[in-house]
């Protein structure tokens, strides 16, 4: 329902601009995802922690959800590993909120750990992106949301990003690998056309 309803609301809006809340404790990674989203014509708000994200969304216990209608956040992209409130914990809190649970949440991580990926998907994540996030990833996410979850590349069956990624996971051998931290900061490779979900499968086979 979330992606389809979001697509309808954006299509009916006079200014169908996607507003993305990006959460990452790394300043460099925040700038990278902000740049990619802006290149893709998205409005971006960045915060440096899960706690700040909750405050912005009105889930910190002080503001309630009174400001949600003014925020109009269409997508939340968060790092998995952060001090304090992790991306996984942030995901759970968002999905437990009746006011926010329909907002798609995408998890990012430099670690390709299948149990972690599966755990996030079970809790309601729309997709799990392997860092460094590429422009192709952002464009694909935006396209999926604007189409209401319809898969790209001539697919006739509508699938959510969650299911698309799960297909990639199911077809790859079980493994755990870690990308170097420096790779997530490689700005020169932002235009790589290989989406993260495909890189997860390829690295699992490596």
From Swiss-Prot:
Modified positions (4-aspartylphosphate) in chain numbering: 79
Range of residues in the leader sequence: none
Induction conditions: By cytokinin (BA) in roots.
Location of the region described as Disordered in the Swiss-Prot/TrEMBL record: 151-206
GO biological process: cytokinin-activated signaling pathway; regulation of DNA-templated transcription; response to cytokinin
Entry GO terms, CC: cytoplasm; nucleus
Composition bias type Low complexity, residue spans: 168-187
SMART domains: REC (SM00448)
GO molecular function: phosphorelay response regulator activity
Subcellular location: Nucleus
Keywords: Cytokinin signaling pathway, Nucleus, Phosphoprotein, Transcription, Transcription regulation, Two-component regulatory system
Post-translational modification: Two-component system major event consists of a His-to-Asp phosphorelay between a sensor histidine kinase (HK) and a response regulator (RR). In plants, the His-to-Asp phosphorelay involves an additional intermediate named Histidine-containing phosphotransfer protein (HPt). This multistep phosphorelay consists of a His-Asp-His-Asp sequential transfer of a phosphate group between first a His and an Asp of the HK protein, followed by the transfer to a conserved His of the HPt protein and finally the transfer to an Asp in the receiver domain of the RR protein.
UniProt cross-references to SUPFAM superfamilies, sorted A to Z: CheY-like
Main location: nucleus
InterPro entries, sorted: ARR-like, CheY-like_superfamily, Sig_transdc_resp-reg_receiver
Domain Response regulatory: 19-146
Pfam families in the cross-refs: Response_reg
Function comment: Functions as a response regulator involved in His-to-Asp phosphorelay signal transduction system. Phosphorylation of the Asp residue in the receiver domain activates the ability of the protein to promote the transcription of target genes. Type-A response regulators seem to act as negative regulators of the cytokinin signaling.
Family classification: Belongs to the ARR family. Type-A subfamily.
The name this protein goes by in its record: Two-component response regulator ARR15
Organism: Arabidopsis thaliana (Mouse-ear cress)
Gene: ARR15
């Amino acid at each position: 329902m979330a992606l389809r309803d979001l697509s309808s609301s954006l299509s009916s809006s006079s200014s169908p601009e996607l507003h993305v809340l990006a959460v990452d404790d790394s300043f460099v990674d925040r700038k990278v995802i902000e740049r990619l989203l802006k290149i893709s014509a998205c409005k971006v708000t960045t915060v440096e922690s899960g706690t700040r994200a909750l405050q912005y969304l009105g889930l910190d216990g002080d503001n309630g959800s009174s400001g949600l209608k003014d925020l109009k956040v269409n997508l939340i992209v968060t790092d998995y590993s952060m001090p304090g409130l992790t991306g996984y914990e942030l995901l759970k809190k968002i999905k437990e909120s009746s006011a926010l649970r329909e907002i798609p949440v995408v998890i990012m991580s430099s670690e390709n750990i299948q149990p972690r990926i599966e755990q996030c998907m079970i809790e309601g994540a729309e997709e799990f992106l392997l860092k460094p996030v590429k422009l192709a990833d952002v464009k694909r996410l935006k396209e999926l949301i604007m189409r209401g979850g319809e898969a790209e590349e001539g697919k006739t069956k509508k699938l959510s990003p969650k299911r698309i990624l799960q297909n990639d996971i199911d077809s790859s051998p079980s493994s755990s690998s870690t990308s170097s931290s420096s790779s997530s900061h490689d700005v020169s490779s932002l235009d790589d056309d290989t989406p993260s979900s495909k890189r997860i499968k390829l690295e699992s086979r490596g």
